[in-house]
Amino acid sequence: MADLSVNIGELQMKNPVMTASGTFGYGEEFSDFIDIARIGGIIVKGTTLHKREGNPYPRMAETPSGMLNAVGLQNKGVDYFVEQIYPRIKDIQTNMIVNVSGSAIEDYVKTAEIINELDKIPAIELNISCPNVKQGGMAFGVSAKGASEVVKAVRAAYKKTLIVKLSPNVTDITEIARAAEESGADSVSLINTLLGMAIDAERKRPILSTVTGGMSGAAVKPIALRMVWQVAKAVNIPVIGLGGIMNWKDAVEFMLAGASAIQIGTANFIDPAVTIKVEDGINNYLERHGCKSVKEIIGALEV
């Protein structure tokens, strides 16, 4: 078997396969289906400083090659996570990573400070696609300045591995990635969902209560792959690739484009065992190509 281990900053992972936030619960929900300890890293659902009810229903819609979601970061807040969830998941034998969201910079900072105290949480993933309520609702991650401000503030408060999740809904994602790196990010993950919408023609109404939502699934893969390739060339920190990864071949393509690790999202809803199948598929690919380590294929695309 090939060496599948990779490092994301100081975070050591047994393999490059991770789960995307919001698609794998807190990990424990999948333990009846697979050995979740085999996964390189589990990113739990988005956590905010205070409880959020999320958006009204309907907030999910199927599309021809993926799905739209407008869940709205529904969660019970970081205190609930610390008191109720953390004790249940802290002994899972893999990297448990918390996705952190907020409506203001101080929300991100306070949440990160609380999670920093949890010994068994070695990293956070910062969701900077959230709207900044103090700046008219514009998402933090759509400008280099906005991204830099929130990443710098969290970096000062958080002492472990800091992953910054980038929005694809921007003019130049490499500019945002460089801003995150310069502000102290240990890694960037991309892409978050693309903004899309669905319409019920008979009712002449939008399908989602919010009109628009986040597009994910196979349809976004070519866009995600291109952005990962661009960002991997633009920064010197590890890149985590996600967006439309449905099988091992997709995962290998992202790594060839420069990703040090990958996240699987929408595919978890289709096949609860997809993470394990992807890990096995990557190993088989490496053996077939005579590679002793997965690191040999990171950025190995010949252009």
Curated annotation (Swiss-Prot):
InterPro entries: Aldolase_TIM, DHO_dehydrogenase, DHOD_1B, Dihydroorotate_DH_1, Dihydroorotate_DH_1_2, Dihydroorotate_DH_cat, Dihydroorotate_DH_CS, Dihydroorotate_DH_I
Active site: 130
GO molecular function terms attached to this record: dihydroorotate dehydrogenase (NAD+) activity; dihydroorotate dehydrogenase activity
Pathway membership, UniProt: Pyrimidine metabolism; UMP biosynthesis via de novo pathway; orotate from (S)-dihydroorotate (NAD(+) route): step 1/1
Keyword Nucleus in annotation: no
Cross-referenced PROSITE patterns: DHODEHASE_1 (PS00911), DHODEHASE_2 (PS00912)
Cellular compartments annotated: Cytoplasm
Binding site residues for FMN: 21, 45-46, 99, 127, 165, 191, 217, 243-244, 265-266
Matches recorded under Pfam families: DHO_dh
Database matches in CDD domains: DHOD_1B_like
GO terms (BP aspect): 'de novo' pyrimidine nucleobase biosynthetic process; 'de novo' UMP biosynthetic process
Record-linked SUPFAM superfamilies: FMN-linked oxidoreductases
Sites where the protein binds substrate: 45, 69-73, 127, 192-193
Function description: Catalyzes the conversion of dihydroorotate to orotate with NAD(+) as electron acceptor.
Protein name: Dihydroorotate dehydrogenase B (NAD(+)), catalytic subunit
Organism field: Bacteroides thetaiotaomicron (strain ATCC 29148 / DSM 2079 / JCM 5827 / CCUG 10774 / NCTC 10582 / VPI-5482 / E50)
